[in-house]
């Protein structure tokens, strides 16, 4: 049962998931920013703040 507990907390798995999440979030973020630029009216765009 100790071997099972070690596999559940495998830091390599968490690093791998975190890496995939970061890459996916960067792709989605760029797409969302582009969509906001093309769809927003000038009034709305003036109120948006990107950090």
Swiss-Prot record:
Broadest EC class? oxidoreductase
Coiled-coil boundaries: none
Return the EC number.
1.4.1.3
Q: Which GO terms describe its cellular component?
A: mitochondrial matrix
Task: For this entry, list what GO says about its biological process.
Answer: glutamine metabolic process; tricarboxylic acid metabolic process
The residues that hold substrate are 31
Recall the GO molecular function terms of this protein's record: glutamate dehydrogenase (NAD+) activity; glutamate dehydrogenase (NADP+) activity; glutamate dehydrogenase [NAD(P)+] activity
Keyword field: Mitochondrion, NADP, Oxidoreductase
* Top-level taxon in the UniProt lineage: Eukaryota
What function does this protein fulfil?
Mitochondrial glutamate dehydrogenase that converts L-glutamate into alpha-ketoglutarate. Plays a key role in glutamine anaplerosis by producing alpha-ketoglutarate, an important intermediate in the tricarboxylic acid cycle.
What the record says about family reads: Belongs to the Glu/Leu/Phe/Val dehydrogenases family.
Subunit annotation:
Homohexamer.
Q: What is the protein name given in its UniProt record?
A: Glutamate dehydrogenase
- Species this chain originates from: Electrophorus electricus (Electric eel)
Lineage at the top is: Eukaryota, Metazoa, Chordata, Craniata, Vertebrata
């Amino acid at each position: 049962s100790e071997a099972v507990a070690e596999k559940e907390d495998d830091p390599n798995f968490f690093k791998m998931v975190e890496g995939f999440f970061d890459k996916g979030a960067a792709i989605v973020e760029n797409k969302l920013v582009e969509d906001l630029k093309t769809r927003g009216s000038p009034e709305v765009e003036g109120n948006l703040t990107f950090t």
